[in-house]
Amino acid sequence: MTERKQGAAAPRPLNRPQGESPKATKLPATLLYADPLPDDLVEVGYVGAAYGIRGWIKVEPHANDASALLHARRWWLLTPPQAGLVATAEASRAQAVCVRVAQSREHSGTVVAQATGVSDRNLAEALKGRRVWIRRADFPAPEENEFYWVDLIGCAVSNEQGELLGEVSGLIDNGAHQILQVAYALPDGKAGERLVPFVDAFLRTVDTAGKRIVVDWGLDY
């Protein structure tokens, strides 16, 4: 159940038919979330559309494996951050919505869900475009020797000789396997990047709790 870019993939563009203007629907106070946001929120998708006429929403997951989204019973629906801001939960804080998920299921590559308090299509349409965030604590436990990509970000990567290769800044899925993007500083101070296949042939240890990964990889590769 290794996640595929959980919270890291760029959302697909939302297209509105030409000439159609968005209709403003006031969100009920019961949906608005005024408390401080949890510090372990992870972006896992976005609301692509309303689904049906009874307030269901359709979510486009960022990951091919939507198990984390289906497992969580509480979602934070946040507006996209303004241009130039880092995509964090706090950057999307304006009029935060928090919903409890009564039902959810996979549907043709998406996840459709019924949220408590969202009772009609107009209200569901008002949530369109919002990013869906869930707590990392609400992810299902991964199986042995499998990892969520969000847990690998920020891990220090060293080789068996004790040489520091850099820090995981992102991941790539090339269809055959996953690849660690390892950021490091070049001698001139500019940013460099190493691409290390995340496969058994090169992996030695992965300690997500200690944020450390050891690989069979040279500094000159």
From Swiss-Prot:
Binds ribosomal protein uS19. HAMAP family: Ribosome_mat_RimM. It comes from the Bacteria. It is found in: Cytoplasm. The PRC barrel domain binds ribosomal protein uS19. Pfam families: PRC_RimM (PF24986), RimM (PF01782). Residues 144-221 form the PRC barrel domain. Belongs to the RimM family. NCBIfam families: 16S_RimM. Residues 1-23 are annotated as: Disordered. This is Ribosome maturation factor RimM. InterPro entries: PRC_barrel-like_sf (IPR011033), PRC_RimM (IPR056792), RimM (IPR011961), RimM_N (IPR002676), RimM_N_sf (IPR036976), Transl_B-barrel_sf (IPR009000). The keyword rRNA processing applies. One of its GO terms (biological process) is rRNA processing.
